[in-house]
Amino acid sequence: KRRPVDTFGAFHYDVAYQKTFEGYLPQSFDALEAALDLLRKHPDYIFVIEQVILAREFLRRRPRRKAAMRRYARQGRLLFAPGMFTMPDLNLPSGESFVRNFQIGRDWLLREIGVEPKLCWMADIFGHPPQTPQLARLCGYDAYMFERGRAGGEDALFWWRGLDGTRILTQWEVGTYYGIALYLSDYAVQRGDEIGFRRTERVVL
């Protein structure tokens, strides 16, 4: 049985990993320019920017692109998720740093782009503390999506209940680091029930 699959463009950006902060910017800016070009050419195209620090640095160096970014964001085609200032490592910082990271990112988005993030998409981060649902909901997120930290065997779409009882709609990215394309093969048909893909009717984005 064939099923429709909605996809969106995105790329994971490391603020600093194997290069310096400045060392990653040229390649990242090329990706953003390509995304803006696709948004202009294709009215159904959607692109997601993870971290506000990248959008801020991009517009500092290329302010002429701000109008386009604001326009596509208002149209709901340029999204920011999680829209924090940087992508956090939740195994290390405190709850205070989670909130401050969100606050700085959200304030910049509201001021410069005119949008507020609603999906807490934690791509390629380590750790999901049990208070995350509470923190995410208090920050104004409607849903949570993550990649690392799950081996499968359960539904990919579920309600995550935090320590205080707060619930948030949560989507595990089927395929994790290797992407969902791996699971759109005959292999997926054989393992669909095991990874919960067949029971996933929609994603949160």
Residue ranges and their predicted role:
Residues 1-205:
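Catalytic-domain carbohydrate-binding cleft regions of carbohydrate-active enzymes
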